[in-house]
Amino acid sequence: LLYGGEELDLEGETIKILHTPGHSHGSICIMCEESKACFTGDTIFDIDLGRTDLNCGSQKEMEDSIRNVISKWDNSITIYPGHDVSATMKQVRKYNTEYLAIMQGTGDGN
C-alpha cells in the first residue's frame, strides 16, 4: 500500500505519494518530479474532476484536494488520469470547468 507523504526513489526519479481524497477517501496522486508527470487516477482529468457522488466520495474533500494540493502544481506538469487523455496543468487551468469553479469559489462546476 502507498500512503500520502511517502517518497520513493526509482532509479534516480523521486516519486511522491500525494493524498488527494475526494473521489474516494483513499485517493492518491503519484508525482514524478524529475519527469514532471503525475498519475492522478480518478482525482482530476483534462476537462473535469472525478465523481464524488459514489460510496466514499466527498465533494468537500475534493475541493480541499484541489485547493491545497493540485492548485500548487506547476503548469508544466502533465497529468495522466486513470482513463481518458493526458493534459498539462496549463491546459487544465484553461479548460477544466470544475477545477476553475472550485478555484474561483463558485462550486463544483456542475
PLM features: what roles do these ranges have?
Residues E7, T14-H19, S24-G109:
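Metallo-beta-lactamase
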